[in-house]
Amino acid sequence: ALQAFQRTHGLTPDGIFGAETERALAPWLRGYAVHTVRPGDTLFSLAERYDGSLGAIETANPALDPFALRPGQRITVPLPFSVVPTDIPWCSALMDCAVDGLTHRYPQLRAESIGRSTLSRPIWALTAGDGLRRVLYSAAHHANEWITTPLLMKYLETLLRAAAAGETVFGYPAEDILFRAALTLVPLVDPDGVDLVTGALPEGEAKERTAAIAAEFPAVPYPDGWKANIAGIDLNLQYPAGWDTARAIKFAQGYDRPA
């Protein structure tokens, strides 16, 4: 499939995912293209060319005057598919693509890195809405529970799409939700651990270290059962809430020493 894509796009069909191939694939990985306006272009012609919709283009470019396009002007054109896949394993690189895609499709979505993981991967926080009621959702504290990440991201995408179209989510007007509340999502708390579990972590010292830790607990499947971050720390046990009880439970399960 990769070689066929390379041939179609005039690239060397070597089957290698190199820099040129990555650039050519970027619109399909991130869900949008950046089009440079040419004489005669209209939003309708762009929607036809990219198999998209006028509404999606207008949502992605809120300051755009559709009747005054200028040659050389750059326009974000959403492509006709979801940015958030739910049928493949997730990883930190996929999260980066999804964050980029959603913020370009829905510029009102605010994204920031609130920190870095042990391996320097960004820990993203995404905020939608400007209401007084503030709500925080987080996912993937535990690496082997990564399925919570696409669940949260798909909810966010569904909410943003519905708000842009004036539709409802579970019977509630999406625009009203974002007017009344500010929703902040931290959808991948443990990017390194998730990369380990889903097979995206490359070979190297970090992976060798996790294998050594896992060898001390042979009853836990490795890497599928890995819950901690890449340093062996259970992130969900780092909050001052019932910590003594959690420690007693972990000791009873045989986790009686630091990793």
Predicted feature residues:
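Extended, structured, electrostatic nucleic-acid-contact surfaces
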Residues: 3-12
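Active-site/substrate-binding loop(s) of hydrolase catalytic cores
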Residues: 132, 146-259
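Short beta-strand-to-loop junctions in surface cap/lid or active-site-entrance loops
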Residues: 124-132, 140
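Primarily a LysM-type cell-wall glycan-binding module
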Residues: 1-3, 23, 27-52, 73, ...
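Divalent metal-coordination and catalytic microenvironments
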Residues: 2, 120, 140, 185, ...
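Short glycine- and acidic-rich boundary segments immediately preceding or forming the N-terminal edge
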Residues: 56, 78-119
